[in-house]
């Protein structure tokens, strides 16, 4: 077996057997099955086995990945076999070799215990043998027989078992590697490489991977090698460098090493330079040459594809693209720099082990990724350098990165890779590098082998003395690449976000996206304004900037100034979209002239401006026209080759196509694709003539331009089809324009176009009701339908199943498939018949709005009969339905951005309508909702649009109601209740907070939220509940429909309704939740106001505007509160106690800031469920003794409770408290011992001016705030706080001495 990057073994399998029993029967069939699976098996070629085992055989065992031991009756009669077994057992223990025992007509227990017939034979063999040798045999027999294997007695026949053994071995050898699965973006690279390699082709193929150092070429190649190895009998992943100046000797040395590795033959000698071709010309090989910088190496090892057998693939990796060209490698994968969003994921994967940062590191991570640049190596290095560091250390590092304009700091980081790789390994406590959650990062690209590095980081003063980037005492543990090449920050030339970042860096002073203003954005837009495309540019940059981590409310692209600038730009330009129509004709061909006119008319009809551009007879190409268009329709005819000037223009157009986002749509007019591709017919004659009269390089550019056009595909003109073709071409152009601004359609088409499936392709599209799933599916269907033999689009599948039932729909489907004339019914057609009938036909099937997987299977007869060449697209509101329909990765349709919503509004509303921003907000990016709302407010008779919009929210258009109702009605009672609580009370709240409270109400909240997400009714954004406003409105409408009288509804949120219920004392047991915004409200409540609300679970009286107070008074006191309450949130509670009758047995959160309470209540209460208590700024509070009963408390907030003096008996002595905030408790003097509070992370005593004594610290504290206290000394236990990151001692004027702290704690704090 060839050597690879993951360790070299000469053989895949070593078989150990007794030739007396199995060589001609069982073994022969097994070897045949292994060979059929391309498994490299050692064969002894008739080696005599009655001699002592020789060194060659021992070497073969040690250099095999798997040993198959075939125990048979006479296996133990051979000392050779037994000695083999001892060696195999040794390799099993010491080299982790895989051993597969096979029991051929012998029972495993006989082998293990050496009994029965097997034991008799073994006993004879042992006679006269040394005891130590017999002992080794017995130990090996017992150990190997104890390994799970295959017993022929348990199988119906040999053939079945042999096939299973071969399959098992194949899986063990070629199991999919996890080394690369966690590398961000690797799948996209592998898909791109697969399309270049064309693995289905039997023709040998040589391709290149090019890109700068650190871009990830080697990592991509290693992942590719891991993925493709099972398909090749011989494979090798090698890196060679010149070590000898003598060309001939160096080449022989290269060949010897190369053939030794790929053929698995040690010390192989070659005599001439033709050995590679002679040895491999009939072999199917996979060869990857890494880090190539010598053209002679390529000529020597992979001179031509003809040197290798059919199906071979050779991949050459280099930084030098010209080296590939010089070796005639034209299929080159140029590794692109990652987008800003992908760069952030790469950085986070290294820093946090996941592709997104923790919430408190989000902004820091975004800026670090931005400052690291776009080179994957630098992103990984910096991420690993920051791995495990505390937030304060990140903040300290920022100035160095911001000032690192020349890359000196990053270069320093990259110079210590081996040192820090070992540090990280040690920090992970010896865990396996590939263990789940600890991604193995491959940063070895272009890393020279053989160097030896110290395990200690050199002194900063000695190694960084030439830079002022470090203080003398800094020790920076980092992982980096030893490469000394630093590539400047570059991205694709057509990457708008990169261009914007570059623009900011060139400002004076330099800026970054977090520090720029709206004026900076406008200045950038002025540099990029071309023919009205500025709006689309802003739309893309809004998406990129927010993917980069900028909050929408802080995004300068969304500012009023930028919006005003866009309006002014629209008023100045007012151009429609221009589409270029290229041709090369002399007006003598009537058909071509007529066709161009048909295209122009169709473009006008669709609202575009056609710019017809004849390349014939033009001296110069109009570059301004090129840059003013996003789509070019190119009519290719034989006239092109009659004009050298036209061909030069064609080259220029294709160069422009490669460097911009221009879309080219070729139309082959009276020429065939094969003529241009193979330069046949008139093209062949013309180019032969041009070859004779012109420079070769000019002709080669023309050929390259022709090849590039052919690679795009396009449409072929046929006589009589010009009008149909014109419509199809313009529809394609329109769709391509839409693609450039529609991330949804673009994403789906990218998935379809890169699909390499050898089986049926089943794609799923899911999203909320009204998001546009049907429209997108229809566009895809119309775009792809011409390429299929049979196409079927079944719209409104859910509705059709209700109207016709699945059986009738199946009859319709069968009749469409086979045609009415065949007279076949559903009962006549079995899946096997369907499979055979359509095996060689292509099928495109779209099922729109599927709500039940069983119905879908019933209509189409299951998914099993579909095969390669068949594509099924399903849309659904439910992700789980798509998964049940065998969709592997459902594509979620994203909501419209604000800019897309704005453009849609402008199609209906003229001028600056005052309600546009409210329309955009109320629609939540749902196209259906936005269209219906905009259409409604655009009617002329409406005088007050804002009032009309509010009425629409209370009574939405029928289509919105129907779309929502169907999703809601399909939920179970648990999910319905959770949804209504979220809609009425928890939209925008933390998911964990909602789960905490609603679980206490008896709901299965986490499961319910997951189901609501799958049903597209809610989503999570930064772990917060996100719900489209139309859905929230509908949820509240459902509650409103429970009863006309608010007192009989389950949930109340409207202040008017709530005040009516409370002041009239009309509450009933129907009410389960009340959330009242009491800003600017003043009212008196009765003592029995909650007397009949037995089922009230959630109660919240609050003020949403700062400066206001909740003025709900209880002049006659309060008799009771409902015992079902899990949330009691009452700001400015007016009484000194809670009702004595109140039993808080279900209470989870007590939130009563700014209350008048002196104590909660008299006596003890059951506080088992209480998790959070907030009594902040309750200035009269003196007694919290009852909290000692709350053993599950996690958060206590008593900030500003200025009357609290002694809490020594009040803090619960349990290990569940996480935070204790007693800031500004100015009379507090001491705290109890905290040694048992093992989960306490935060202690805040700042502003406790009389606080003097602290006995000890909780052992796992991370944050301690003691600013402004009167403490005189700190307890010695502070030295043991290994998790401490913040220690605030500001203005501790009485502090006399402080224990000496470990260096680690000082550095963290």
From Swiss-Prot:
Catalytic activity annotation: NAD(+) + H2O = ADP-D-ribose + nicotinamide + H(+)
Organism superkingdom: Eukaryota
Domain ALOG: 488-585
Keywords: ATP-binding, Coiled coil, Hydrolase, Leucine-rich repeat, NAD, Nucleotide-binding, Plant defense, Repeat
EC number(s) per entry: 3.2.2.6
Active-site residues, record numbering mapped to chain: 84
SUPFAM superfamilies assigned: L domain-like, P-loop containing nucleoside triphosphate hydrolases, Toll/Interleukin receptor TIR domain, Winged helix' DNA-binding domain
Entry annotated with the keyword Magnesium: no
Xref: Pfam families: ALOG_dom (PF04852), LRR_3 (PF07725), NB-ARC (PF00931), TIR (PF01582), WHD_ROQ1 (PF23282)
UniProt entry tagged with the keyword Repeat: yes
One Gene Ontology term from the biological process aspect of the record: defense response
Domain notes: The TIR domain mediates NAD(+) hydrolase (NADase) activity. Self-association of TIR domains is required for NADase activity.
Family, as annotated: Belongs to the disease resistance TIR-NB-LRR family.
Protein purpose: Disease resistance protein that cooperates with RPP2B to confer resistance to Hyaloperonospora parasitica isolate Cala2.
Protein name per the record: Disease resistance protein RPP2A
Organism, as annotated: Arabidopsis thaliana
Gene: RPP2A
């Amino acid at each position: 077996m060839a050597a690879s990057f993951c360790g070299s073994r000469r053989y895949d399998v070593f078989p150990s057997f007794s030739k007396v029993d199995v060589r001609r029967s069982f073994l022969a069939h097994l070897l045949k099955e292994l060979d059929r699976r391309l498994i490299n098996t050692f064969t002894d070629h008739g080696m005599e086995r009655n001699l002592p085992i020789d060194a060659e055989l021992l070497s073969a065992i040690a250099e095999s990945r798997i040993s198959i031991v075939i125990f048979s009756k006479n296996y133990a009669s051979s000392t050779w076999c037994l000695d083999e077994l001892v060696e195999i057992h040794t390799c099993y223990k010491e080299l982790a070799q895989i051993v597969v025992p096979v029991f051929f007509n012998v029972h495993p227990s006989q082998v293990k215990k050496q009994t029965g017939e097997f034991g008799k034979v073994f006993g004879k063999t042992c006679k006269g043998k040394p005891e130590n040798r017999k002992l080794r045999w017995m130990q090996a027999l017992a150990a190997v027989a104890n390994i799970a294997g295959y017993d022929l007695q348990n199988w119906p026949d040999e053939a079945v078992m042999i096939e299973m053994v071969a399959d098992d071995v194949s899986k063990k050898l070629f199991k999919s590697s996890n080394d690369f699965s966690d590398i961000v973006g690797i799948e996209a690279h592998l898909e791109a490489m697969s399309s270049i390699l064309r693995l289905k082709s039997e023709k040998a193929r040589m391709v290149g991977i090019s890109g700068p150092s650190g871009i990830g070429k080697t990592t991509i190649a290693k992942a590719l090698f891991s993925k493709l190895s099972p398909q090749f009998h011989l494979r090798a992943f090698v890196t060679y460098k010149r070590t000898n100046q003598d060309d001939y000797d160096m080449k022989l040395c290269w060949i010897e090493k190369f053939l030794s590795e790929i053929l698995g033959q040690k010390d192989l000698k070659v005599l001439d330079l033709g050995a590679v071709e002679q040895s491999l010309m009939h072999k199917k090989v996979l060869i990857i040459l890494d880090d190539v910088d010598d053209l002679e190496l390529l000529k020597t090892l992979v001179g031509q594809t003809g040197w290798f057998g059919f199906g071979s693939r050779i991949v050459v990796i280099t930084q030098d693209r010209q080296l590939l060209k010089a070796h005639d490698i034209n299929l080159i994968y140029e590794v692109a720099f990652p987008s800003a969003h992908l760069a952030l994921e790469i950085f986070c994967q290294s820093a946090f082990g996941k592709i997104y940062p923790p919430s408190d590191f989000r902004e820091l991570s975004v800026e670090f990724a931005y400052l690291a640049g776009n080179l994957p190596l630098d992103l990984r290095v910096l991420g690993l350098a920051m791995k495990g560091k505390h937030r304060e250390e990140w903040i300290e590092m920022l100035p160095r990165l911001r000032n690192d304009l020349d890359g000196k700091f990053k270069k320093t980081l990259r110079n210590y890779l081996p040192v820090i790789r070992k540090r990280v390994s040690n920090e992970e406590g010896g865990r396996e590098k590939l263990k789940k959650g600890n991604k193995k990062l491959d940063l070895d690209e272009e890393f020279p082998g053989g160097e030896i590095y110290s395990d200690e980081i050199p002194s900063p003063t000695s190694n960084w003395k030439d830079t002022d980037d470090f203080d003398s005492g800094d020790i920076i543990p980092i992982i980096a690449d030893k490469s000394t090449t630093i590539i400047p920050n570059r991205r694709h030339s057509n990457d708008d976000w990169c261009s914007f970042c570059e623009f900011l860096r060139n400002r004076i002073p330099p800026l970054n996206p977090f520090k720029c203003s709206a004026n900076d954005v406008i200045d950038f837009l002025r540099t990029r304004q071309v023919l009205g495309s500025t709006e689309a540019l802003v739309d893309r940059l809004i998406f990129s900037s927010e993917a980069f981590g900028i909050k929408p409310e802080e995004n300068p692209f969304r500012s009023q100034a930028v919006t005003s600038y866009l309006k002014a730009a629209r008023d100045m330009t007012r151009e429609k979209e221009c589409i270029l129509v290229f041709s090369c004709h002399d007006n003598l061909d009537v058909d071509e002239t007529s066709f161009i006119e048909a295209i122009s008319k169709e473009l006008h009809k669709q609202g575009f401006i056609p710019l017809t551009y004849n390349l014939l007879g033009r001296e110069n190409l109009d570059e301004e026209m090129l840059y003013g268009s996003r789509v070019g329709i190119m009519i290719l005819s034989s006239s092109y080759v009659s004009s050298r000037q036209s061909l030069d223009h064609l080259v220029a157009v294709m160069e422009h196509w490669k460097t911009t986002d221009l879309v080219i749509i070729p139309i082959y007019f009276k020429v065939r694709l094969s003529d241009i591709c193979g330069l046949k017919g008139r093209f062949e004659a013309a180019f032969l003539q041009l070859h004779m009269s012109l420079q070769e390089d000019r002709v080669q550019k023309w050929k390259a331009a022709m090849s590039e056009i052919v690679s795009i595909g396009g449409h072929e003109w046929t006589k009589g089809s010009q009008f149909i073709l014109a419509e199809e071409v313009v529809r394609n152009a329109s769709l391509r324009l839409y693609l450039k601004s529609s991330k949804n359609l673009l994403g789906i088409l990218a998935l379809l176009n890169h699909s390499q499936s050898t089986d049926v392709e089943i794609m799923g599209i899911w999203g909320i009701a009204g998001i546009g799933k049907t429209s997108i599916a229809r566009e895809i269907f119309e775009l792809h339908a011409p390429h299929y033999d049979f196409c079927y689009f079944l719209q409104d599948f859910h509705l059709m199943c209700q109207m016709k039932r699945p059986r009738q729909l199946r009859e319709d489907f069968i009749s469409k498939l086979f045609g009415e004339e065949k007279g076949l019914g559903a009962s006549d057609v079995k899946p096997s018949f369907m499979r055979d009938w359509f095996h060689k036909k292509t099928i495109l099937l779209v099922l729109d709005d599927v709500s039940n997987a069983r119905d879908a299977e019933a209509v189409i007869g299951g998914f099993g009969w579909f095969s390669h060449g068949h594509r099924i697209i399903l849309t659904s509101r439910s992700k789980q339905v798509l998964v049940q329909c065998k969709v592997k990765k459902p594509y979620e349709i994203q909501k419209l951005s604000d800019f897309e919503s704005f453009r849609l509004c402008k199609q209906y509303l003229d001028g600056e309508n005052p309600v546009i921003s409210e329309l955009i907000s109320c629609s939540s990016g749902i196209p259906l909702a936005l269209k219906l709302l905009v259409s409604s407010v655009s009617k002329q008779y409406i005088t007050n649009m804002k009032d009309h919009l509010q009425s629409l929210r209370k009574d939405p258009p029928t289509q919105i109601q129907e779309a929502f109702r169907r999703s809601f009605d399909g939920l179970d009672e648990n999910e319905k209740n959770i949804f209504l609580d979220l809609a009425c009370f928890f939209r925008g709240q933390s998911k964990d907070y909602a789960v905490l409270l609603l679980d206490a109400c008896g709901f299965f909240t986490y499961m319910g939220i997951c189901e609501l997400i799958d049903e597209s009714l809610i989503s999570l954004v930064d772990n917060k509940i996100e719900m489209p406003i139309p859905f929230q409105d509908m949820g509240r409408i459902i509650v409103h429909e429970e009863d006309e009288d608010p007192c009989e509804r389950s949930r109340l949120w409207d202040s008017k309704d709530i005040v009516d219920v409370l002041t009239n004392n009309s509450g009933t047991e129907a009410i389960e939740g009340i959330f009242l915004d009491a800003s600017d409200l003043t009212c008196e409540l009765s003592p029995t106001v909650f007397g009949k609300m037995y089922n009230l679970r959630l109660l919240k009286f609050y003020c949403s505007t700062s400066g206001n107070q909740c003025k709900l008074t209880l002049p006659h006191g309060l008799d009771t509160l409902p015992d079902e309450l899990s949330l009691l949130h009452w700001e400015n509670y007016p009484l000194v106690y809670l009702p004595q009758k109140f039993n808080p047995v279900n209470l989870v959160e007590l939130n009563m800031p700014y209350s008048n309470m002196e104590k909660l209540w008299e006596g003890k209460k059951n506080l088992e469920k209480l998790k959070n208590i907030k009594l902040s700024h309750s200035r009269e509070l003196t007694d919290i003794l009852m909290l000692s009963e709350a053993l599950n408390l996690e958060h206590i907030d008593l900030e500003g409770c200025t009357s609290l003096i002694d809490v020594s008996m009040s803090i619960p002595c349990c290990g569940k408290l996480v935070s204790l905030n007693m800031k500004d408790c100015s009379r507090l003097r001491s705290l109890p011992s905290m040694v048992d509070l093992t989960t306490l992370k935060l202690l805040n005593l700042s502003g406790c001016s009389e606080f003097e004594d602290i006995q000890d610290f909780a052992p796992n504290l991370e944050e301690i705030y003691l600013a402004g206290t009167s403490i005189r000394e700190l307890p010695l236990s502070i030295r043991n706080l290994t998790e401490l990151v913040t220690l605030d001692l500001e203005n501790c004027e009485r502090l006399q001495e402080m224990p000496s702290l470990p260096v680690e704690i000082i550095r963290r704090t």
